[in-house]
C-alpha cells in the first residue's frame, strides 16, 4: 500500500490512546473477553472510541481529536464510566499498568482481525508476547517536514517519557528489576527502537518505499518505532509510555508531550543530526531499567546527567508553552512527582514488599482505576 500524503492537521491538537487490561476476578488473570465488552459499549460511547488491540485481553480507549488535555480528560472520563459498567455487568474488571504481572503469553488469543492475523503470521509467538499495555499520544502537525522535525525533537526526550510513566516492574510472575519492562518485549521486532534517520518528508517517503519492499509493511501501522509519523492523521505519535494506573496520570503525560511539541515547533531549539541518535538505545535502556534514577549521556559532549535533574530542566523549559496550550496543571503534577521521587513502578514494588500478592496487586490496580 503506498504511503498517503501527509494530512494537514491543526498544530498541537491531541489524540490519546490507552491500552487497558481486561481481568477476570477473583483470580485477576487476564480475561479473553474484550470483544464482548466492545459489543456491549459500542452504542453507548458518544465521544472517542473503544476498540480491539492485538489480543482479546486488551481494550483500547481512544479519544477523538482534542484541542487540549481538558477535553481529552472529559472524553476519557465518559468512556471510563461506560466501560466500567459494562465490565461489572459481565463480571470483569479493568486496570492500567504496562504489563500484567503474572499472565502467561501462551494463553493469549489474537483478535479475529485481518491485520492482527496477518501480523501473527509474520511474527508468530512474538505477537502473543506483545500482550503489554501502552499509552500513545498523537500531536497534530501542519506539514510532513514539521512532523519530521518534531519526531527528532521528541526523540531526545524518550528516556524522560519512559521514566515518568514507568509502570511495568513485574512480568510472568517475576520482578524484572526494570522500572519499565514493557519496551523490552519489542526488542526482537526488526523495527524496534528509533525510526531510521531522515531529514525531511521526502526522504521519509523514500524510506517507507524501501521498507515496503520487505512485504512485511503494508501501512505505517505495521511499523513499531518508538515515535512514528502518522500521515493519515497528520500527526506524530509517541508510543513509549506504559499505560498509567490512573486517567489523571495519562492526561498529564499527554500534556507533557503536547507542551514539549509546542516548545519544539515554536522555538526550534535544535539543529537535528544523525549523531543525536548515537547513544539513543543506551539512554533508553537507562530509563527502562532505573526510571528517573537513570543517567543519560549526551552523544556530542559525553556529559552524563541524572534523569531526575534533566527532567526537571525539561519541565522548566516547556512551562511557558504549557501555559499557552492549557497544560500547566499537567506540568505542575509531573514536577511534584519528580521531586517526590515516586513512580508507579516503585509503588507496585512497595505493595509487594509489604506482603501483598501479585493477585492482590492487580486487584488494587482495578480499584485505583475505578476510583480515579
Curated annotation (Swiss-Prot):
E.C. designation(s): 6.3.2.2
This protein's UniProt keywords: ATP-binding, Ligase, Nucleotide-binding
Pfam families: GCS2
GO BP annotation list: modified amino acid biosynthetic process
Catalysed reactions, semicolon-separated: L-cysteine + L-glutamate + ATP = gamma-L-glutamyl-L-cysteine + ADP + phosphate + H(+)
Coiled coil: none
Family matches, as InterPro entries: GCL_type2/YbdK_subfam, GCS2, Gln_synth/guanido_kin_cat_dom, YbdK
Recorded GO MF terms: ATP binding; glutamate-cysteine ligase activity
Similarity comment: family membership: Belongs to the glutamate--cysteine ligase type 2 family. YbdK subfamily.
Subunit structure: Homodimer.
Function: ATP-dependent carboxylate-amine ligase which exhibits weak glutamate--cysteine ligase activity.
Protein name in UniProt: Putative glutamate--cysteine ligase 2
Species this protein is from: Shigella sonnei (strain Ss046)
Gene expressing this chain: ybdK
Amino acid at each position: 500500500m503506498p504511503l498517503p500524503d501527509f494530512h494537514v492537521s491543526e498544530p498541537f491538537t491531541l489524540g490519546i490512546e490507552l491500552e487497558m487490561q481486561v481481568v477476570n476476578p477473583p483470580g485477576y488473570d487476564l480475561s479473553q473477553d474484550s470483544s464482548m465488552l466492545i459489543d456491549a459499549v459500542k452504542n453507548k460511547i458518544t465521544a472517542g472510541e473503544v476498540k480491539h488491540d492485538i489480543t482479546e485481553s486488551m481494550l483500547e480507549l481512544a479519544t477523538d481529536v482534542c484541542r487540549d488535555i481538558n477535553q481529552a480528560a472529559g472524553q476519557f472520563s465518559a468512556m471510563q464510566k461506560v466501560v466500567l459498567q459494562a465490565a461489572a455487568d459481565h463480571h470483569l474488571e479493568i486496570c492500567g499498568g504496562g504489563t500484567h504481572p503474572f499472565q502467561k503469553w501462551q494463553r493469549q488469543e489474537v483478535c479475529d482481525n485481518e491485520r492482527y492475523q496477518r501480523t501473527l503470521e509474520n511474527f508468530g509467538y512474538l505477537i502473543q508476547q506483545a500482550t503489554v499495555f501502552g499509552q500513545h499520544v498523537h500531536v497534530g502537525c501542519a506539514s510532513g517536514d514539521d512532523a519530521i522535525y518534531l519526531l527528532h525533537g521528541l526523540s531526545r526526550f524518550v528516556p524522560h517519557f519512559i521514566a515518568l510513566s514507568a509502570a511495568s516492574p513485574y512480568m510472568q510472575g517475576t520482578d524484572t528489576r526494570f522500572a519499565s519492562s514493557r519496551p523490552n518485549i519489542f526488542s526482537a521486532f526488526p523495527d524496534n527502537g528509533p525510526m531510521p534517520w531522515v531529514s525531511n518528508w521526502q526522504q521519509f517517503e523514500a524510506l517507507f518505499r524501501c521498507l515496503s519492499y520487505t512485504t512485511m509493511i503494508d501501512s505505517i501501522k505495521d511499523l513499531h518505532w518508538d515515535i512514528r509519523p502518522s500521515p493519515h492523521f497528520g500527526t506524530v505519535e509517541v508510543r513509549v509510555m506504559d499505560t498509567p494506573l490512573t486517567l489523571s496520570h495519562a492526561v498529564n503525560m499527554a500534556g507533557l508531550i503536547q507542551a514539549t511539541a509546542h516548545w519544539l515547533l515554536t522555538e526550534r531549539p535544535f539543529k537535528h543530526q544523525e549523531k543525536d541518535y548515537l547513544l539513543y538505545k543506551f539512554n533508553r535502556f537507562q530509563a527502562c531499567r532505573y526510571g528517573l534514577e537513570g543517567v543519560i549521556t549526551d552523544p556530542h559532549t559525553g556529559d552524563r546527567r541524572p534523569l531526575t535533574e534533566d527532567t526537571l530542566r525539561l519541565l522548566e523549559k516547556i512551562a511557558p508553552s504549557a501555559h499557552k496550550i492549557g497544560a500547566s496543571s499537567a506540568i505542575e503534577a509531573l514536577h511534584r512527582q519528580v521531586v517526590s521521587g515516586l513512580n508507579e513502578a516503585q509503588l507496585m514494588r512497595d505493595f509487594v514488599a509489604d506482603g501483598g500478592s501479585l493477585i492482590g496487586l492487580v486487584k488494587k490496580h482495578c480499584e485505583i482505576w475505578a476510583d480515579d
